[in-house]
Amino acid sequence: MSSRGNGVAVSDDLKMGGGAKRSLDRIREAYLMTGGARRIDECSGNVDHRRAQLEGYGGARHGLKCNGGYRARYPGSMETPPLSAWGYGIATISTDTNTVLDSWFPKPQLGEPPANFDPHLIPADLAALEGSDDSRGVIRTGVTTVIGLTSPPQSTSDAYLRLHLLSHCLVTPNSVNLEGIFGLLPIVAFTTRGPVSPEFYDTHRMALMESGAMITSLDRFPPLLNYVTPSRVRIADVTRVRLGAHLAPGTTVMHEGFVNFNPGTLGTSMVEGRISQGVVIGDGTDIGGGASIMGTLSGGGKEVISVGQRCLLGANSGIGISLGDDCVVEAGLYVTAGTKVRVLSGGDGTEVKAGTLSGKANLLFRRNSVSGAVEVLSRDGQGVELNSALHA
């Protein structure tokens, strides 16, 4: 751990106006005088006596105590998720906008901090990363963040810690409260040299490009691999998997695959299509090239979709309903909740809305090549079997 005298705790929210700017000026001054930037404490609101308190800061509102409300369960399990988490990290703060651009938590932890926890100290290896980078217009400072997972996130670092928990597979999709997360994540120019504020990059574009700082994405959510390297996972295109994606060991995401924040795979899976926010994919499932799974972030959709084990979404297919285990959707067929489906197995060809079949197992959805009608029939035995050579 780093020494107490080498740094103190200050607030994450350095974007709150005049008080925040004065505080940032003090941080810069302290950095020049001591050779180390001051640290951030989001744990208890106890700011070191050497710091003036930031305007708008209140550690108590950072969700340290869980007061009920949000209590999701792990998919397929009666186990309730942990109520709190904490971590030591490094925050990148823009010097031109006084905004926390990102926070990196290399070893996030579930539960309450240990009894000997001191929020004013961070590990020495993280303290060594503190400093300023004038070429990017940022300073890097340590953060100590403790959060309640049932409460909405309250700050940028709080939001980043939740995304790290998901991508480290410490929590499962939909088990952590992410309400309001978009408002806490600024739009950032994520570059090959780290995060930069878009305004700073636009003003200093030539110098940044000459230094090798090329923009890889301009987004609120960064690429997952900038922060986490999942075990036994293949990701062909770094930019197509966001931080906050939950990728179980054995998952392969090919070039045209996309995984948003807070969906995920629960086992070995092939992803060549799009997995929207909140969608959960079972073990042994293949999301074919260009396939699409409807989400709830836009377009009015309300149902969170899940896909069972050993399912196949054919190339360029799509679903707006959940699938049970061992289901197949024919290539090119999009099945929404309102799609009229003709039931062929064990029936007289009655038409029903596909939504009535949501979550049922052992089904094959196909389009009749003569009439164009969408049909569903029962399948026997297991579903698809993945090629083990394609998975770590």
Task: Give the label of every model feature segment.
Residues 339-355:
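A conserved acidic, glycine/proline-rich C-terminal tail/linker
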Residues 233, 239-241, 245-247, 251-253, ...:
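A structural motif detector for beta-strand N-caps
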Residues 13-14:
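Alpha-helix boundary/capping motif
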Residues 318-320, 334-336, 341, 370-372:
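Short Gly/Pro-enriched loop/turn and capping motifs at secondary-structure junctions
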Residues 2-3, 10, 19-21, 27-29, ...:
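Terminal amphipathic alpha-helical/low-complexity segments used for targeting or macromolecular assembly
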